[in-house]
Amino acid sequence: MRQYCLLLIVLALAAALSDNAVASTLAVARSEIGAPSAVYSERLLRSEPQDEDTFEDRAFGLNWLRLRWLRLGAAKAKTTDVISARESKWIEAWANKNLSPNYVYKQLGLAKQGDKAMQSQNYRIFEAYTERLFAKDQALYTKWLDAKMTPEDVYKALKLDKLLGAKAANSPDFRRYEVYMFKWHELN
């Protein structure tokens, strides 16, 4: 059934395009009968000459199809920037688990894509996740600064003092501690 529909569409398109060719050859043939020196390339029904920008085909022009494709493409471009409810649940779950951005980047398959990762549909999810983490961290820094916590207090609050040696430096919270220490020293 699908093949017949496709065949019907192709035949209709060919007929419509050939109808325009037949109309122009008929105009030339009729003009040679009446006055051999005058050759008309447009339809005989027009009373005033038309330029190419306003020329209309007898069956239909393909400009409406191009315009529709452009409109659909623009609508699709607008919707791809919006994160769906399902994707926002993923982002929230990842933020609650405190997953590192590098881990999420790999899980979304962006590491395999190399330079083309920014063109992927998953890249907008990654951007939304990093923005969510950034907002979460900024709220923490503001809370700690308002409470006038020293870097040592934050170190203990993040429980980095319980980790031994190099384990503290490998912890995801250690980066938060470093950023807070920088912000605290800027203000004091």
UniProtKB/Swiss-Prot annotation:
Signal peptide: 1-16
One Pfam family named in its UniProt record: RXLR
Hydrolase in keyword set: no
Motif (RxLR-dEER): 43-58
Motif Host plasma membrane localization motif, chain ranges: 73-78
Keyword Transport: no
Chief localisation class: secreted
Compartment(s) of residence: Secreted; Host cell membrane
GO annotations of cellular component type: extracellular region; host cell plasma membrane; membrane
Keyword annotations of the record: Host cell membrane, Host membrane, Membrane, Secreted, Signal, Virulence
Free-text function comment from the UniProt entry: Effector that triggers cell death in a variety of plant species (including tobacco, tomato and soybean), regardless of the Rps genes present. Avh241 interacts with the plant immune system via at least two different mechanisms, one recognized by plants dependent on subcellular localization and one promoting infection independent on membrane localization. The cell death triggered by Avh241 in N.benthamiana requires the two host mitogen-activated protein kinases, MEK2 and WIPK.
Family statement drawn from the similarity comment of this UniProt entry: Belongs to the RxLR effector family.
Annotated domain remarks: The RxLR-dEER motif acts to carry the protein into the host cell cytoplasm through binding to cell surface phosphatidylinositol-3-phosphate. The GAAKAK motif at position 73-78 is required for host plasma membrane localization.
Protein name: RxLR effector protein Avh241
